[in-house]
Amino acid sequence: MTRLSGYLLPTEKEAPADAEAISHKLMVRAGLVRQVGSGLWTWLPAGWRVHQRVTAIVREEIDAIGGQEMLMPVIQPAELWRRSGRYEIEELFKLEDRRGADLVLAG
């Protein structure tokens, strides 16, 4: 672990053994992200700053063409996913609310 300009930078000398994608290897070695489980990632301080900068650039470009940003809920009605044909995906996390309505974790 290194401190660079007051930021925690937990770099790794070796790429994770299970890493297949070059981007995965590089981001872990650079101390940008840490995998905490299958498909679960933690943004480390330097990585979160990069994420915020990229988001700002995308936001500027959207504004420049007159676009509008929106935010959708992470938990969505399953009907949206059924209509798009994506509801039957095996890995999709499905749940039910207290009234029995089908929902999907859209994350």
Language model features: what each stretch is:
Residues M1-G107:
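TRNA-recognition modules of translation machinery and tRNA-sensing kinases, especially anticodon-binding
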